[in-house]
Amino acid sequence: MKPLKIIFAGTPDFAARHLQALLTSEHEVIAVYTQPDRPAGRGQKLTPSPVKSLALEHQIPVYQPKSLRKEEAQQELAALGADIMVVVAYGLILPKVVLDTPRLGCINVHGSILPRWRGAAPIQRALWAGDTETGVTIMQMDVGLDTGDMLLKTHLPIEDDDTSASLYEKLAGQGPAALLDALAALSEGTLSAEKQDEALANYAEKLSKEEARLDFAKPAKNLWQEVRAFNPWPVSYFEHQGQTIKVWQTSVLAEPSTKASGTIVAAGKQGIDIATADGMLRIHKMQLPGKKPMDVADILNSRGDWFTPGTLLASPEASE
């Protein structure tokens, strides 16, 4: 395999793990592009991205343009003479002139099996939709949103106890190895590109805090999927006793309830059972305002009066 001269573009920890894999490979990372430093923490101090911090540790030149649309930034990138540009959760749009600059173009690591779940939140949307499988796609970038030809795909079963946090970790483990495999095949000219089937494409829009509100008029299975998708952010919740109560862990009880949706059917050490449109949702772990996430059994010790059987939890429509 002929080592490649690589420009790496990425910003968060997920991207940094891929950069780390490249740094320990035979390839040469000649430059790193990342988002400008952002205010963070209580003091709102300007803080470098995880990718920038890693690049500086390895004395790699770092570029932080606010945009790659300006000719000056494009000429600066072209002057680096890279064979290929690897893009992982960078956060800036790459114009066509940039995509066409490296000899082998630009490739991207995406956290889904394309063309399903193009866009910003593929891990979360896969969980919420009840998908049984996800994975990583290495694709050749074009000007569309995750529409480029697919070069390599990995597959990962979604387990019942997976959350967005656990899937993120699993895909962050799969991605770097897949990237190195794709680069090796590209270097040797043995990789064939596969067009995406537009008929199978859908989009994973960013999650919003508004979406995180639980509606017990939905089936229990849907709510269980939702809670897993919104863990660790923005975390599913419901309003009760004038408080926002976050829900971290649930399970589905298949037995039907004759109670109205949102009614607390039982509350004890096992959890709080709530009637839904189909089946019951058992809440195992919650978080009261100003508190840490706790097992329901511990919350009932101090707030059992809030969750007595027969209590009706208001639906979003009723409380607006």
Curated annotation (Swiss-Prot):
State any single GO MF term.
methionyl-tRNA formyltransferase activity
* Family under the similarity heading: Belongs to the Fmt family.
Broadest EC class?
Answer: transferase
The UniProt record lists the EC number as 2.1.2.9
Q: Provide the protein name.
A: Methionyl-tRNA formyltransferase
Which residue ranges run through the membrane? none
Keyword line: Protein biosynthesis, Transferase
* UniProt GO cellular component terms: cytosol
In terms of superkingdom, the source organism counts as: Bacteria
Q: Does the keyword Protein biosynthesis apply?
A: yes
Q: Which reaction does it catalyse?
A: L-methionyl-tRNA(fMet) + (6R)-10-formyltetrahydrofolate = N-formyl-L-methionyl-tRNA(fMet) + (6S)-5,6,7,8-tetrahydrofolate + H(+)
What biological function has been recorded for the protein in this entry? Attaches a formyl group to the free amino group of methionyl-tRNA(fMet). The formyl group appears to play a dual role in the initiator identity of N-formylmethionyl-tRNA by promoting its recognition by IF2 and preventing the misappropriation of this tRNA by the elongation apparatus.
Q: Does the keyword Transferase apply?
A: yes
What organism is the protein native to?
Answer: Shewanella amazonensis (strain ATCC BAA-1098 / SB2B)
Q: Which residues bind (6S)-5,6,7,8-tetrahydrofolate?
A: S112, I113, L114, P115
The gene designation is fmt
